[in-house]
């Protein structure tokens, strides 16, 4: 792999590198001296194109591009619930404490608090056989959500070492697993997963149970199945966002992932304020104890809107694999499509209807197909995207 990759051209959020780079499609990279987060989106014979998820003002040709060797990922572990992230899973509350109200370029804040300790209860012992999706420990993440630590998909082996119950940080090793080749794998309280790849399931089940939304007009006239997908079309000011807020507050899902993709900042502020004031009718605890917010508002970089949708659905699939019914509200996929249109224009691709890229339908279907009522190793649950 070339160690001398440098910027050749800059066009808004699109950066190009000329010559042999050794980079792979969808590889995560750091661009420029400030190490802006980017992703390889095109590989031509002598030109590599990168989509940058941060503001590129101030970048100049000749600055270095650093390879990571891996895809864009989400960090999955305790501390996700009650948190608010940007489109690439940077914690906005922690950033506000260190950098103020605005995100500085190249901000590398860890998605989860690496110094916080969690009270872990171990569920396995040496000699147990584990495979991907099996649960080896748990901890109370909030008063209403018990976080379950799962073996990453694709990993299988025998437990050779287990730490005792106690308090651990997210990067502490609590279980050592030995695979068939004799290689040891250290399991911690967190794992990483590429946001564009759906987490595997055992099989899909037919959607037969209704999702009770808490809105009688929807439940009566437009019922939604658990594991289904629904869209809320409408013009400006017709109440799409308010309807989604109501669904997020009152639907009978265990976990709510609310993605503000290109929406106004005051709407996300309203959601934050109201969710903290309202009690969950099932538990009596604040709604924030089961909610994750991803805020990629209209004044944030356009390119990060695309990542925010995939980040949200990856977090939802993670909690789904624990056995929770998970509902994800994406507000809105139309602004996500507008972001794709802008990037497509920068790439000088042939436009389709209304200037949108020709691959928009396939991108939309990839997202909505990640919903479903499924069976994993031990559980049956859902993911529900709504626009």
Residues covered by each model-derived region:
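Nucleotide-state-sensitive switch-loop elements of NTP-binding domains
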Residues: 265-315, 350
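Short beta-strand segments of a lipoyl-like beta-sandwich/carrier module
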Residues: 15-17, 50, 59, 112-131, ...
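Interdomain "pre-motor" coupling segment immediately N-terminal to P-loop NTPase/helicase cores
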Residues: 66, 70-73, 86-91, 95, ...
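P-loop NTPase nucleotide-binding/switch module
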Residues: 98-120, 138, 149-150, 171-172, ...
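N-terminal accessory targeting/assembly segments
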Residues: 1-96, 101-104
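Conserved small/polar residues in nucleotide/adenosyl-binding loops
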Residues: 379-386
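Conserved P-loop NTPase nucleotide-binding/switch module
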Residues: 239-255, 260-261, 265-266, 274-275, ...
